[in-house]
Amino acid sequence: MFPLFGVLGGCSPAFVYMFIDALARAGVKHGMRKDQALQIATQSVLGSAKMIAESSEHPWELVDRVCSPGGTTIEGVLSLKADGLETAVQNAVDAAVEKDSKL
């Protein structure tokens, strides 16, 4: 179990950095200045992490709370699910655990 703790704690910052970068680049793609997009993406991730840390709710309950019926957020969430965000994250953890087992 210790290798898994090492992977989740040690590798996840890079995964989160990649997510923040992807959010910021999407903002730039749609016309936002890079520095502004990065600041918004970073603050959004910080606020979301704080909400999870301080809440007794499961992350999916928090997702449901911010998705308005027929709104922009649910549309984006459905796109992330269809594009395999969860699978990509799970595969990254699997690959890191596998690599750790060979070290």
Model-derived features: positions:
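Anionic-ligand binding region
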Residues: 1-38
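NAD(P)-dependent Rossmann-like dehydrogenase/reductase catalytic/cofactor-binding core
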Residues: 38-103
